[in-house]
Every structure is written in C-alpha cells, then in structure tokens.
C-alpha cells in the first residue's frame, strides 16, 4: 500500500502523523521543558543535518535530558522521515525537518517513571 500521509518518528517508531498525540501531562507541553532544532532541505536532502543534531545534543546535555537515542540514530531517523515525506510534496518544494525532545510525561503516581518524548516531523516550507 502506498503511504499518502506524512509520517513522523515518535518515541521509537515511524507512525502516520494523524496517529500521534502528545499527552497533556508532557512537560514540554506544560512547561516548555523541551529542546528542538530545525534544518531545511534542499532537493529533499537535509542541509548540514549532523551540525544541527550536534547542536541539539549540546542543548539536551545542558538541560540534562537524555533522549534515549544516539546522535547518529537521530540523524538516521530524521532522514527516513524526510525521505518518506518529501515524496508527498509538489515538485520544487522543500521542507523543514524538526527534532523535538521533551523531558517526558510528568509522573503523577508513585513509581511512575519519566521517559523523554522524542518527535521528528517535517513541514513544507511555504514558498
């Protein structure tokens, strides 16, 4: 089956964008306790992606957020999302690829463990 909907990477897996939801208890949503970076593409290739991911990980270290995946994996997943979603754009269009990592869902019960929320998404550049 041909996928006609954009996909995202969400917490370890590629999913259709419409099937992803962020918890109202996510610290990124509640308090802005998150880091993001964005790189644009040229002809479907992310521009200086490794530099962008390096900067993202510098910020994550500063805030002491462990995304649970290595920088190389973040790059690989970003490229996979771009590769899929770029095919859905009209000819000549490019996109942003964004990595968003929050500290995770606020624990509410004893024994709850906070794990990061990791999202990689794309948006068409509006020109």
Go through each PLM region and give its residues:
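Conserved alpha/beta cores of soluble small-molecule-handling proteins
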Residues: 1-127
């Amino acid at each position: 089956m041909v996928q006609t909907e954009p996909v995202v990477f969400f917490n370890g897996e590629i999913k259709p964008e419409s099937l992803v939801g962020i918890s109202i208890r996510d610290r990124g949503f509640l308090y802005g306790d998150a880091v993001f970076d964005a790189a644009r593409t040229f002809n479907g290739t992310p521009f200086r992606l490794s530099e962008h991911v390096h900067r993202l990980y510098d910020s994550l270290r500063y805030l002491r957020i462990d995304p649970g995946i290595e920088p190389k994996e973040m790059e690989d997943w970003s490229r996979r999302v771009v590769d899929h979603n770029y095919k859905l754009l009209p000819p000549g269009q490019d996109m942003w690829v964004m990595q968003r990592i929050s500290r995770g869902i606020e624990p509410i019960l004893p024994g709850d463990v906070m794990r990061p929320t990791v999202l990689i998404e794309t948006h068409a550049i509006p020109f």
